Structure formats: structure tokens, C-alpha cells
Amino acid sequence: MTSISSEYKLPEKTNTVSTNNSSLGKDEFLKILMTQVQNQDPLNPIDDKEFISQMATFSSLEQMMNLNTTMTQFVENQDPFTTYVDWMGKEVSWTDGKSATDKTGTVSSVKHFKGNYYLVLDDGTEISPANVMSVGQSSK
């Protein structure tokens, strides 16, 4: 007999994913602050300066979080731009989808228009980076 009885088998492990968010959000902070105000000692209320200090601290924290989000978005949006700027002065091989032959040109500038990037070549031709097949040193 080569099988193991089910009474000796270990129970199957189930994977659990914790979605516990340990950061304190605006709503949670305001709930804590309101609870503090509601449960304060009537004979010894919260000092106005302390209350204003707590609100200012929270406001400052919220602004820093918003700045962090904005900077993250800025960096994410700049990533393609910095890549394309690195192509300036380099020769690109590209296709326009109309002809069977590849074309080449040297990138002179990068243009951003309505959410799309375009490479402007020395001859004034504007191409989409999606059409570029290779980037190399300029032969000029």
C-alpha cells in the first residue's frame, strides 16, 4: 500500500490577500477629530490653539500627499518625453505603412501635441515614435 490515509494529510493552505490600508485618510482623521471634540471634558475643553494646530498639521499632510501624487504623475508623463529627447541628433529608421521600403532621417526635435508625441526630422517630416524601427548614431 503506497497511499497515505486522509487522516494523516495536512489541510490545504488557502492564500489570503490582506487589503489593510495602514494610511490614515482625510475621512478617518476628521472622524477622530470629531470624536475627540465630542468626548472632551466640558470643564477642560480643547484649547483653540491646539485644535487649529491639529487642523494645520492635517492640512499640511494632505497637501504633501497631493504633491506626491502630482509629482508621480509628472514623472510618469515625462518618461516617454525624456526617451524621445535622447533620440535628438540620432538617425531613425521608420516606416510610414504606405511604402514597402524603410525611410531614414535624423531627429531634430520632439513635439507633444494633444497627448501624442511626434519626432520632427531634419527635413521637417513628423513621425510617430510607434513607427520607428531603429535608432542609431547619425551618419552625418
Curated annotation (Swiss-Prot):
GO BP terms: bacterial-type flagellum organization; bacterial-type flagellum-dependent swarming motility
Q: Where is this region: Disordered?
A: 1-21
Q: What are the record keywords, sorted? A: Bacterial flagellum biogenesis
Positions of transmembrane segments: none
Keyword Transmembrane helix found: no
Is Mitochondrion among the key words of this record? no
Q: Family assignment?
A: Belongs to the FlgD family.
Q: What is this protein called?
A: FlaA locus uncharacterized protein YlxG
Instruction: Record the organism.
Output: Bacillus subtilis (strain 168)
- Gene, per the UniProt record: ylxG
